[in-house]
């Protein structure tokens, strides 16, 4: 019985870590998404003129930050607009 409890708690720990990771790095989810217009090479970001604060602003988007701030790229994770 203790083994099953330990196994269940380990599973809950892994699931909670995965949920926290996707909450902190929403770009990881977006990279795996498929869109209806993939054949045209368009992305959702291309329909906007700029990227809002704390949204991803990587090279693939090619759009400036709305505030004029630079797109900051950490060592690990998505590039974001900071202001």
Curated annotation (Swiss-Prot):
Coiled coil: none
Any GO MF annotation of the entry: toxin activity
A cellular-component GO term for this protein: extracellular region
Protein name: U25-theraphotoxin-Cg1b
Protein's UniProt keywords contain Secreted: yes
Function per UniProt: Probable ion channel inhibitor.
Subcellular compartments: Secreted
Originating organism: Chilobrachys guangxiensis (Chinese earth tiger tarantula)
Disulfide-linked positions: 50-66, 57-71, 65-79
Keyword Signal: yes
